[in-house]
């Protein structure tokens, strides 16, 4: 089962992302566990055992880029997909080995393309 997390400090955006992800996974008939977090501190307090993490950059307190750096330093090897309004942070995302970078408001076709690529990459990973 694929484990997916969404970390965004805006409740509406968390709910929208959860709905998009659930809908996509149901459409593809792929079982998943979906977890939602309201900030970087929350996700760092979890077991971080997610295959895919959708992470907002601009959040109150700890921003998503800082959370991503700390997660990578603690051994998180899953896919990071940033979701943000900040187009200018795209180059910094490479420093934490981001899988993709989605700009809000999300385009449905771009989201689906990213999900398809992420799931294909997971299937190809050994183990």
Regions from the PLM with identified roles:
Residues 1-3:
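Non-catalytic signal-transmission and effector/linker regions of two-component phosphorelay proteins
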Residues 8-10, 85:
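Acidic di-acidic motifs
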Residues 9, 40, 57:
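Residues immediately flanking
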Residues 11-35, 73:
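Two-component/phosphorelay signaling modules centered on CheY-like receiver
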Residues 19, 41, 69:
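Active-site phosphate/pyrophosphate- and oxyanion-stabilizing loops and adjacent acidic/basic residues
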Residues 33-52:
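Acidic, metal-coordinating helix/loop segments flanking the phosphotransfer/catalytic sites
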């Amino acid at each position: 089962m694929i484990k997916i997390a969404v970390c965004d400090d805006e409740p509406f955006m968390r709910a929208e992302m959860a709905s998009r992800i659930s809908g996509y996974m149901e459409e593809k008939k792929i079982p998943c566990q979906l977890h939602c977090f309201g900030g970087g501190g929350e996700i760092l307090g979890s077991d971080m055992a997610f295959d895919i993490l959708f992470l907002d950059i601009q959040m109150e307190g700890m921003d998503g880029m800082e959370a991503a750096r700390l997660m990578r330093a603690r051994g998180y090897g899953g896919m990071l997909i940033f979701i943000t309004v900040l187009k200018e942070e795209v180059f910094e995302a490479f420093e934490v080995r981001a899988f993709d970078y989605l700009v809000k408001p999300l385009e449905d076709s771009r989201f689906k393309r990213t999900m398809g690529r992420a799931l294909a990459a997971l299937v190809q990973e050994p183990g």
